[in-house]
C-alpha cells in the first residue's frame, strides 16, 4: 500500500530556549603526543516542529527539525538525528567522549501532540510501485525513554587519500507510553583519534591527492592536523578500450595529452572473458593506483571505451544490476570509489565515433553558436504521491539558488508536472533548441523518461547539432547498460545530436535518496503541495553545490558529490547508490554552466631542447599542459599570483610545442611555442 499522509494539521512547535544555536559545529582542534588528535564539537537543537499525519495504521505525529534528519529503525519512532562524515588518520583508533550536555523533559501534550510519533519509513522507489507502510508495534509499548545511542562513530572506509568515518548524534529520546520526550541539548563531545600513523597519512595525501577530488574533500570535516594543503599534481587518465577502437581513440588521447593529462591506454583483449576479465582488469587498475610513479600517477579518471559486452561490468552486490563501481573502489573492504569513472559505451565504431567527436568539439569550444550554454531545461515528472513533495522542490531548489537570471542563465525552461504526460512536446522542443544542462526527476525506464515521456526515438531525432547538454536523470533504470541500448547510452551515441554526458541509474532509484543526491541532506517534510525547496543553509551539499560551487568539478565529480550526500545520511541504500549511478561520457569533462569567458594567457614563444621550464601567466587555478608530438612535456596548476613555472622534460630538438590552458567555465586557450 502507498504511504499517504492525508489530513495534515500542523500541531505545534517546541522552542528550546536554552539551546546555543542549532546543528553541529567544530569548537576546537588539538594535537598531542603519541599520534593523538582531538576534535571538540558541539550539537544543539533549538526548535522542534510537529504535524499530524493519517496513515494506514492510524494517526501519528511527525516530529522534525530542519537542521536534523530522520533516524531510528524502520517502523520504530522516527526521531531527529544529525550526521557528518569525518576524516580520520590512517592507523588511528577513534572514539567519542561526551563532555557535557543539558537535558530537559517535555510532555508532548503541552504542545498539541496527542498521537504517537510517526514511525520511520523507508524511501519509496521511483518505479511507481506501492510502498508498504511499516509499523513495529513492539517499539511503541516500551516503558521509559528510548532512542538511538546519543553519539556514535563508525569507520566507513577510504576514499582516495581520506580515511572516513560516519558520525551520528541522536539528541532526542521518546517515551511512547507517557507521550514524553527528553532532549539532550548543547552536547559537547570530543572525537579522540589515538595512535595515528601520521607518516602514512601524509604519504597517502602526497601520493593520492588529486584536484579531481578537491570538492569532495570539502564535504568532509577535516581535523586541522590533516589539512596538508593542495598539491600541484599532474592528473592521470586511464583509458580501457576494445582494441578495435584504437585508431578512433587516437585524437581523443592526443587532446587529453595536450590538456596536461598523463594518459595511458590499455586494451581489453589482455584480460580474458567473464569473471576472469573483471578480476584481471580490477587487479590491473588496483596495481596502477597503488604503485604510482612520476610517469604515471595514480589515475584520477578511468574511461571505459566499450559496452558491457566488450568491457564487462561487475554484478552488483546489493541487487541484480551491473556496476562499474568495483573497478574504482580500490581500497579493500569498502565500497567508496577512489577514481572517477565514465563510459563511452559502444559496440562498434558507429556508436563510438559520435561520442569522441562531440566530446572534442565541446572541450575545444568549437561551437558555431555558444548561446545555448545560457539555456537550461528542468523537469519534475509526474507521480501522484511524490512529485510535489520531492520532484518540485528538487527543481525549485536548483532555480532558487543556482539556475536563474542572477547567475547569467537566460532561458530556463521549467516543467513542474501537475498531472500525467504534460508538456511532452514542449520539453523535447526545448532540448532540441540546445541547452547546457537538462535535469529530470521522476519515473524512468530502460528506454525513456516515463512521465512526461522522452524516449530514445526522441533523442535520435533531436537534431541539436553543436548544442549538446549534460543530462542528469534522477529516475529508475535509464542506465541499464547490459541491454543493447539503454536511454543513457543513446544520449551519447546519437550522431549530431544527443548529449555530452548522461548520469543515471542502472537499477531503481528512490525518492528520498534522489532528493538528497541533488540538493543535499535535509529533513524532507511531506506533504509539500507547493513544492517549497529547503533552505540552502539547512541542507548539506549535494550535486548542485558541486556544479556551481565546485570550481571546475567534472561531470563524474557531480555524480560523486550526489552519492556522498546519500552516504552522509542514515539511508540503508548507501552501497546500492554507489553501485547504480553511472556516467555515460568522459569522466573528466567539465560542463560549461553558462557561456564561458576568454582567458588572458602569456608565455615566451620560443624555447630550445635545453629548456627546463616555461613561465606561463594565466588565471589562478587554471591548468597548463605543454606537449609536443602528442607527448606531454609538462603540466601544472597556476598559482594564486597568476603564474606558474611549468617544468619540462624531453623537449625535442626542433618543431613546435602546444600550450593548452583550461579552467572552470573558461574558453580553453590553445597556443604554440617554437622550438629552436
Predicted regions and their residues:
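Edge beta-strands of extracellular beta-sandwich domains
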Residues: 665-676
